[in-house]
């Protein structure tokens, strides 16, 4: 989707908390804001 591999990694190589929607590092085991362990990777393909 992105033009450069570095840009794509910056945009999509993060995890999103399923409870509070906070952005977390890709290496995170739990959310930095609420401590929830349910994390997903940010979607690389648009929905809809």
Curated annotation (Swiss-Prot):
<dbReference type="Pfam" id="PF13240">
    <property type="entry name" value="Zn_Ribbon_1"/>
</dbReference>
<dbReference type="GO" id="GO:0005840">
    <property type="term" value="C:ribosome"/>
</dbReference>
<keyword id="KW-0689">Ribosomal protein</keyword>
<dbReference type="GO" id="GO:0003735">
    <property type="term" value="F:structural constituent of ribosome"/>
</dbReference>
<dbReference type="InterPro" id="IPR026870">
    <property type="entry name" value="Zinc_ribbon_dom"/>
</dbReference>
<dbReference type="GO" id="GO:0006412">
    <property type="term" value="P:translation"/>
</dbReference>
<dbReference type="InterPro" id="IPR038587">
    <property type="entry name" value="Ribosomal_eL40_sf"/>
</dbReference>
<protein>
    <recommendedName>
        <fullName>Large ribosomal subunit protein eL40</fullName>
    </recommendedName>
</protein>
<dbReference type="InterPro" id="IPR001975">
    <property type="entry name" value="Ribosomal_eL40_dom"/>
</dbReference>
<dbReference type="InterPro" id="IPR023657">
    <property type="entry name" value="Ribosomal_eL40_arc"/>
</dbReference>
<dbReference type="InterPro" id="IPR011332">
    <property type="entry name" value="Ribosomal_zn-bd"/>
</dbReference>
<keyword id="KW-0687">Ribonucleoprotein</keyword>
<dbReference type="GO" id="GO:1990904">
    <property type="term" value="C:ribonucleoprotein complex"/>
</dbReference>
<comment type="similarity">
    <text>Belongs to the eukaryotic ribosomal protein eL40 family.</text>
</comment>
């Amino acid at each position: 989707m992105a033009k450069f591999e570095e840009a794509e990694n910056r945009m999509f190589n993060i995890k999103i908390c399923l409870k509070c929607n906070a952005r977390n590092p890709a290496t995170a085991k739990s959310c930095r804001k609420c401590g929830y362990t349910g994390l997903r990777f940010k979607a690389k393909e648009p929905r809809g």
